Amino acid sequence: MGEEGPPSLEYIQAKDLFPPKELVKEEENLQVPFTVLQGEGVEFLGRATDALIAISNYRLHIKFKDSVINVPLRMIDSVESRDMFQLHIACKDSKVVRCHFSTFKQCQEWLSRLSRATARPAKPEDLFAFAYHAWCLGLTEEDQHTHLCQPGEHIRCRQEAELARMGFDLQNVWRVSHINSNYKLCPSYPQKLLVPVWITDKELENVASFRSWKRIPVVVYRHLRNGAAIARCSQPEISWWGWRNADDEYLVTSIAKACALDPGTRASGGSLSTGTNDASEACDTDFDSSLTACSGVESTAAPQKLLILDARSYTAAVANRAKGGGCECEEYYPNCEVLFMGMANIHAIRNSFQYLRAVCSQMPDPSNWLSALESTKWLQHLSVMLKAAVLVANTVDREGRPVLVHCSDGWDRTPQIVALAKILLDPYYRTLEGFQVLVESDWLDFGHKFGDRCGHQENAEDQNEQCPVFLQWLDSVHQLLKQFPCLFEFNEAFLVKLVQHTYSCLYGTFLANNPCEREKRNIYKRTCSVWALLRAGNKNFHNFLYTPGSDVVLHPVCHVRALHLWTAVYLPASSPCTLGEENMDLYLSPVAQSQEFSGRSLDRLPKTRSMDDLLSACDTSSPLTRTSSDPNLNNHSQEVRGSLEPWHSSPEGAETVIDSGVGSPQLTVGEMGLPPPLPSSQKEYLSNKPFKGHKSCSLSYKLLNTSVSWEMKSNTSDIKVLEETEALAPDPSAQEEQGRTSDGLGKPPEQFLEKEAVSSLCSVSSKCGGACDFPEPPQDPLTGTPQQPHLDSMQISPSRCTPDHSQGSLCNPPSVASQTPEPNTDLLSQDPPGSTASISHQEQPSSVPDLIYKKEDAGKRGSKNGQLLENPRFGKMPLELARKPISQSQISEFSFLGSNWDSFQGMMTSFPSGETTPRRLLAYGCCSKRPSNKHIRAAGPCLGGQWAQREGMKSPVCSSHSNGHCTGPGGKNNRMWFSSHPKQVSSTKPSLLSCPSPVPPLYLDDDGLPFPTDVIQHRLRQIEAGYRQEVEQLRRQVRELQMRLDIRHCCAPPAEPPMDYEDDFTCLKESDGSDTEDFGSDHSEDCLSEASWEPVDKKETEVTRWVPDHMASHCFNCDCEFWLAKRRHHCRNCGNVFCAGCCHLKLPIPDQQLYDPVLVCNSCYEHIQVSRARELMSQHLKKPIATASS
């Protein structure tokens, strides 16, 4: 045989079926302004008027100067051109997007592109969900488990679990029929149907021939306390001829009889039963499917009168007889009552929604808003739906009667009423897990036509089939959540995400029209599930007000005046700004930046002189912006210099503006992704108890002893820098006391300076003429920014301040600084009274010394002998400026914590003296958006000019989570405050830094969409964070006390040492020739103290014991549940069990004789790093003492 050649068959991966298309750019210097998902490819990229526009195979992305539009393509309902230069984009969730172009030709070109991208798919594979899943298959196994997890066991085995949970008697009363196996009876019904046990499959076939679309009456819910059931079906086909079906009539009445035979827990005691126990027992023991009229059935309690709830009006029901439909006649259905609810059909709901979308797209403050909203009748339709559901719930709960619900076809209004009634009755469906089961069973399994109603079914051009039925039902659930905020485990963000992905086609959950189509197309295996994103373990969707264990039946107020417009969906512009937004100039060339800066939008607020009437300007609906064209700003535009003043939140209606550097416009708070502002009264209330971090955020580094002297000369202000670091978390009261200490105003407690030699307090004075010393302001726990009442209602005009290079500043050498041009910046506007000051400036890359000083008096001034850190990747940097890798899951689980959690603390980075080219920092984003186990770098407020503002201060990780400050090794806030004169702020001349390639913004979810904000849930997360922080702090204190007790126990000398024992020591001392002091003197007693005994580390003799796998059902850190796709990982240091997102870092552990890097959890990783840093610090602190003594 010859040599083996290449294989004849090529191995084709699933992603090869979905190759990316070539990117078409209108300008070569444009860059994609967002992070693409797996399988997502940008096809068109160009520029509109004052915006960047991009179209991928998943979304439409428009990046304006002060906002970002990020809409999945399947969310777009219609696209049209208006006024020749404007694209009018209407979305299926009622949003309307308008995009202006400079020329008519460009507008028509983008109209054509967008129309082709949003057209109905020709085949199912044209939907992005298939490409997304196929490209995710090429990832590593660990990534697949995190990102491609299918629905949990509660979804896959939902029917069996539901029957057991609701207590159906499947032996004597009910049975599960398999007549619909392989969907041979009804393709829009599940394969297993629950019917009374004496109903045969032959009778079910006869009933199916009489009901529309063969949707027969089946039971879907049973009340545990009284046994009353809820059934659903479609309309009977009576037609004008008045047809009847005996099997259908018998099946309906049999449901009521079965409910009487299977009473609930409350009725089992005899409250609802009038028959004898013997007869009941005889019927239970001798019951057979052929005994349809046994004596036991007749002798038991008379069945309750069944309520047939027709969702239509009586007129509509009778009119349907012309098309072959109709309604039940009470004469033909004995012991039944028919009631009509008068709910509108899909055509009326579609028109109402279109009117609602038109009203919501009007100007922000129309004079006829309430009347226009009333004319849409959207709230009226919600009210009717809620009344129908309340009627069903009251009939089942209070009267103990079974209910049969249907409309025309049984897949639109019927699931709305049934699912809503089940939420009212059963608290299980108000949990995250139960709500998922409810959507899967009542909407997906029973054939709601998601493909037609949402408009993504292939080859279906009938627009009359579209209707936001599921969106309307989610809106009604939102109304219940508003009225009962403590009885739902999920929050509003959960519902908003569900609305988005009902139309996005990113997940395959809502594709196709019925379960038969999904199974034939193998959708469940070829697409991801939306429940992977909306999983029960995701804390972002957890309602912190939820009270578990409550079995209250909900009785909502259904009046229109009690309902609210769902602003988070229909009016997102009025909601707090979303995260993940960045300045558009980051993705443009310098030439384009200057052009965009000069051509600002004309629909902004008119410019005034220094915004003197800012309060009245904030009352208007137009956003507030500032440009250098203001006459009062041009005079000082050349003198603006940066400092490190953190952000401050402004009152409602005002926007804090922050300059982004050379040639770029100011950035609003919403653009940086800051949390929404609160009124001053709430700020004062929330600032009483600031949260402090408790974990370390540092990498491996070296301490260098460096002598640095720095001074600044100016005529206006005295700038002080306050830096705090801690190695161990101190006592909370002492921690607060130390936080209030600032350069002469107080002195930190002695124990913090003596125990670890890590915590230090220092100030760097500058000779700027005058002094204005402010203590460290209290931290606002909601926004993470300090409150500065001393700076309220004043205008700040920075001026120049040149560093003194002769004193050894950390700036670049004068020769280098003179070669770089001086950038121009814009001033910030004056803040209104009642808000904190906002300062516009550039960052100082090297002018401020980022030092950690040694222990010395707090009031001492002058040159300091500081210590820098040396990171192997970044070079020299201060201790608190080292970066820490964090995982995506940590951000998504605690995305809005305002407290100083280590998961969100980006560490600042500075560059030492002499380095002309700064090292590039790590990027926090990647080209392909990945789930929790992908590491990212949290970018903190670094000292790096323009790029520092874009990459650090504006990064979503820092601005939204770390809130503009960093955490040192001990978890204490390492902030740098500038106490400035009320009139001016001085700073040094900045050095120009090289700007690396732009990094896309970091989104908080795996779906690539921003996370909806909620101020109340934000605050509740802070409260939970503070509670966990206190618990962790108490645990550390207990461990520390235990270690001290162990050391005392091991190192304690004998109570009464024998004389010969002391003589041995004395002789030993004499033999060594030591005549300095007598061992029998008073000082000799110190030699026998515990200080003379070397402490023994218990870890050297102990082996870490691992927690067994079977004992760990949840992650020790994030508390997520383990299952097939969420594997267990043991930390080699502590032995606890974690998920992949909480245990992915590797370090050697010499104490455990593990000298190669092994897997450790995030907490142990930080603890080991801090321990090593302490050892290095203690070694370097001892070197000067040894040198002096020699």
Curated annotation (Swiss-Prot):
Species the sequence originates in: Mus musculus
Stored InterPro entries: MTMR4_FYVE (IPR046978), MTMR4_PH-GRAM (IPR035997), MTMR4_PTP (IPR030590), Myotubularin (IPR030564), Myotubularin-like_Pase_dom (IPR010569), Prot-tyrosine_phosphatase-like (IPR029021), Tyr_Pase_AS (IPR016130), Tyr_Pase_dom (IPR000387)
Modified residues (Phosphoserine): S8, S610, S629
Ranges in a coiled coil: 1020-1052
Domain comment as written in the entry: The coiled coil domain mediates the interaction between MTMR3 and MTMR4. It is essential to bring together CEP55 and PLK1 during mitotic abscission.
Topology with respect to the bilayer: Peripheral membrane protein
EC number(s) on file: 3.1.3.95
Residues annotated as domain Myotubularin phosphatase: 153-570
Chain intervals with Polar residues compositional bias: 618-637, 782-847
Residue positions binding Zn(2+) 1: C1115, C1118, C1139, C1142
Record: residues binding a 1,2-diacyl-sn-glycero-3-phospho-(1D-myo-inositol-3-phosphate): N320, N345, I346, S408, D409, G410, W411, D412, R413, R453
Protein residues bound to a 1,2-diacyl-sn-glycero-3-phospho-(1D-myo-inositol-3,5-bisphosphate): N320, N345, I346, S408, D409, G410, W411, D412, R413, K449, R453
GO biological processes: midbody abscission; negative regulation of endocytic recycling; phagosome maturation; phosphatidylinositol dephosphorylation; response to denervation involved in regulation of muscle adaptation
Protein name: Phosphatidylinositol-3,5-bisphosphate 3-phosphatase MTMR4
Localization terms from the record: Early endosome membrane; Recycling endosome membrane; Late endosome membrane; Cytoplasmic vesicle, Phagosome membrane
Region (Disordered) residue spans: 616-694, 724-749, 773-848
PTM (free text): Ubiquitinated. Ubiquitination by NEDD4 probably leads to proteasomal degradation.
Residues in FYVE-type zinc fingers: 1109-1169
Gene Ontology MF term list: molecular adaptor activity; phosphatidylinositol-3,5-bisphosphate 3-phosphatase activity; phosphatidylinositol-3-phosphate phosphatase activity; protein tyrosine phosphatase activity; zinc ion binding
This protein's GO CC annotations: early endosome membrane; early phagosome membrane; endosome membrane; late endosome membrane; recycling endosome membrane
Keywords for this protein: Coiled coil, Cytoplasmic vesicle, Endosome, Hydrolase, Membrane, Metal-binding, Phosphoprotein, Ubl conjugation, Zinc, Zinc-finger
Function: Decreases the levels of phosphatidylinositol 3-phosphate, a phospholipid found in cell membranes where it acts as key regulator of both cell signaling and intracellular membrane traffic, in a subset of endosomal membranes to negatively regulate both endocytic recycling and trafficking and/or maturation of endosomes toward lysosomes.
Active-site annotation: C407
Residue numbers covered by motif PY-motif: 999-1003
Stored Pfam families: FYVE, Myotub-related
Family: Belongs to the protein-tyrosine phosphatase family. Non-receptor class myotubularin subfamily.
Subunit structure of this chain's protein: Homooligomeric. Forms MTMR3:MTMR4 heterooligomers; regulates the localization of both proteins. The MTMR3:MTMR4 heterooligomer can also recruit both CEP55 and PLK1; occurs during early mitosis, regulates the phosphorylation of CEP55 by PLK1 and its recruitment to the midbody where it can mediate cell abscission. Interacts with SMAD2 and SMAD3; negatively regulates TGF-beta signaling through SMAD2 and SMAD3 dephosphorylation and retention in endosomes. Interacts with SMAD1; negatively regulates BMP signaling through SMAD1 dephosphorylation and retention in endosomes.
